[in-house]
Amino acid sequence: MAKHDRGLRFQPAGGSRAPQIPVGKKQRLTIQRLANDGRGIAFVEGRTWFVSGALAGEEVEARVLGSHGKVVEARAERIFNASDLRRPAACAHAGRCGGCSVQHLPHDEQLALKQRMLAEQLSKVAGVEPEAWAAPLSGPEFGYRRRARVAVRWDAKGKQLEVGFRAAGSQDIVAIDDCPVLVQALQPVMNRLPAMLRRLSKPQALGHVELFSGSALAVLLRHMAPLSDSDLTILKDFCDFHQAQLWLHGEGEPQPFDPSQALGYRLETWDLHLAYRPGDFVQVNAGVNEAMVAQALEWLAPQADERVLDLFCGLGNFALPLARQVREVVAVEGVATMVARAAENAASNNLHNTRFFQADLSQPLSAAEWADEGFSAVLLDPPRDGAFEVVRQLATLGAKRLVYVSCNPATLARDTVELIKQGYRLKRAGILDMFPQTAHVEAMALFEAS
C-alpha cells in the first residue's frame, strides 16, 4: 500500500547561525544540477538553493519561499536562458499548483530523473545495484489520475468560495477548474464543480471535495453543517447530470446518498472487481496499477501448487490476482477495516483460496498464526516508512522469491541492506511511473534467496 508524496524537504546539518533570507526576496541564480526531487540546485555565498521550476544550466530569477540555516527554498519566476530540455507546461497553473512539479521537463527526462534517484539510493545506502534493470513501467503522462481531492475554503474577507488545489509549499488555494492529469471522465465534473458549490446555502461550512473514477464516477462532499433540502437538490442534480454517485461526509463516516451505491475498480486482466470506500487506499493511476500487478506476478513467477504471502495487502490489489494462479494466498494488513474489505472482495469474486489477517507488521512474526507453515514466495507493498521489522524476519518463512513494491526508494534501499543480510540477492529492480509530472518515485525489486 502506498502513499501519495510531494517532494523532499532538505534540512541543514548542524546549528548554523546564518541570518535568514527574507521570504519574497528575489535572487539571480545559475542552476548547477537537479536534485532528486526535480528542483534545481544553486550555490550562493555558502548557501544551497533548491529552486522549483528550474533546470540544470539555466540562469533564473527565483523568489525565496523559506530558508533554514544555509538551505534556501525558492521558486523560479523568470528564466533568462532556458535549457534545451525545457518544454512549455501543459497546465497554466503548473508553476503554482502543488500537484505537478516537473511539467516543464520532458517525460523521458522525468523517467531518467526517477531512475537516477532509485539507482543512487541503492548504491549509496545498500552498496548494490540489481543484476538487471527493468525498463520503466509507465503509461500516458496526462489524463491518468482517477482520484483527486479538491480544496474548498471560504474567504471571509473577500466573501467568496475558493475552489481548486493547494499551492506548492503553501495552504493557499490555486483556483483551478481544469486539470490535465485527471482522467477524461472527471474533466467535465471538475469544470463545473466551482460554480455548483457556490450555489449552496452555507459555503462557509464546506470542506473538501473528492472525485472518483472507477466502476462509476463519484463526488464526495465534506460538510460541517447540515445541508438544506435545496442544497441536496443542487448536489443531486449535479451528480445526475454527470452520471455520478453522490457521497456525503458530515458527522461520522462518508455515506452514499443512495445506499445501494458503492465505489470500485476493475483489474481487467484477471476479471476482478474490487470494492472500496472513501478513505481506503487505492492507486490513482489505473493503467500503471494494472501493469504493476502484472509485472509483480511475472517476477514472482508463482506456481499452481504454491503458498504465497502478501504483506500490507490493502484491498487485495495483489492478493486477488495471485489467488487466480496459486494454491493459497495468505494476506496480511495492519488496518482492520481494509482486512474486512479485502475478504469481502475475495468472496464477491468467488475466490476461496485466500485467507486475510489483521496484524501489526512492526512486531515479530513468529507468534502469528499464519506464519507457521512457510511460503514459497512473498510479496510486500509497505507504506513510505518501509518494512524494516518484517524484512528482518523474512528468512524464517523460507521464501525463495520476494517482490518488494516501494513508494520510497530511501526505505527500499535501507530494507535491501537487511535482506542481503538475510541471504537474499537483488536480482532486478525498476521504477514505476505512477505519478507522471511529479518527481515522486515508486519502484519494484525482485530478491531471490542465495
From Swiss-Prot:
Residues binding S-adenosyl-L-methionine, per UniProt: Q283, F312, N317, E333, D360, D381
Annotated [4Fe-4S] cluster binding sites: C91, C97, C100, C179
Reaction(s) the record says it catalyses: uridine(1939) in 23S rRNA + S-adenosyl-L-methionine = 5-methyluridine(1939) in 23S rRNA + S-adenosyl-L-homocysteine + H(+)
Annotated EC: 2.1.1.190
GO molecular function list: 4 iron, 4 sulfur cluster binding; iron ion binding; RNA binding; rRNA (uridine-C5-)-methyltransferase activity
Domain of life (superkingdom): Bacteria
Keyword Ribosomal protein: no
Listed InterPro entries: 23S_rRNA_MeTrfase_RlmD, MeTrfase_TrmA_AS, MeTrfase_TrmA_CS, NA-bd_OB-fold, SAM-dependent_MTases_sf, TRAM_dom, U5_MeTrfase_fam
Annotated ranges, domain TRAM: 20-78
Sequence segments annotated as region (Disordered): 1-22
Listed GO biological process terms: rRNA base methylation
Similarity remark: Belongs to the class I-like SAM-binding methyltransferase superfamily. RNA M5U methyltransferase family. RlmD subfamily.
Matches recorded under HAMAP family: 23SrRNA_methyltr_RlmD (MF_01010)
PANTHER family: 23S RRNA (URACIL(1939)-C(5))-METHYLTRANSFERASE RLMD (PTHR11061:SF49), RNA M5U METHYLTRANSFERASE (PTHR11061)
NCBIfam families tied to this protein: PRK13168.1, rumA
Protein role: Catalyzes the formation of 5-methyl-uridine at position 1939 (m5U1939) in 23S rRNA.
Protein name, per record: 23S rRNA (uracil(1939)-C(5))-methyltransferase RlmD
